[in-house]
């Protein structure tokens, strides 16, 4: 068992996938698996995944018929070996090397089942903070339209499975 399974749903992402995976490879936390779910891509995403798998033994690739990112994420949760899971879409990236380590430290320190961090939206060189994480306590995001930003969260895998999330 590893600490974190990073689940990457992949669909026709040959142009962005290498950058996304590189941002996972550079993480300071190395006790991770990178679980890529190829969701029926028709481009060269499979070639990028094969290359990544050869380059880094933490990469594990699964292939399925196209069923959508949600189904790919759920398959990733079911197949994951990590105590925690994180999601990273194939067109997103972790902005620095300490993202997973910081989230894991916060989750273990607090005992939280779900732990989140900051979000920045970038378009070219234009970067805007959308949510800034502080350590002052729990921030309720229920009233904010942030539900699509899976990459900012770390989830206790057992919590997701037990609650069928």
Give short role names for the model-derived ranges.
Residues 1-165:
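Nucleotide-sugar donor-binding/catalytic module of glycosyltransferases
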């Amino acid at each position: 068992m590893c600490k974190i399974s990073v689940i990457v749903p992949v669909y026709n992402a040959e142009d962005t996938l290498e950058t996304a995976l590189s941002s996972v490879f550079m993480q300071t936390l190395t006790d991770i698996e990178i679980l890529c779910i190829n969701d029926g891509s028709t481009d060269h995403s499979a070639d990028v995944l094969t290359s990544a798998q050869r380059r880094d033994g933490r990469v594990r690739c699964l292939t399925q018929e196209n069923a959508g990112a949600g189904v790919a994420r759920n398959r990733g949760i079911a197949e994951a070996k990590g105590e925690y899971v994180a999601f990273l879409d194939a067109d997103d990236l972790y902005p620095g090397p300490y993202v997973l380590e910081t989230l894991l430290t916060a989750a273990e320190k607090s005992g939280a089942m779900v732990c989140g961090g900051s979000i920045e939206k970038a378009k070219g060189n234009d970067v805007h903070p959308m949510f800034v994480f502080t350590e002052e306590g729990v921030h309720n995001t229920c009233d904010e339209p942030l539900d699509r930003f899976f990459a900012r969260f770390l989830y206790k895998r057992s919590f997701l499975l037990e609650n069928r999330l």
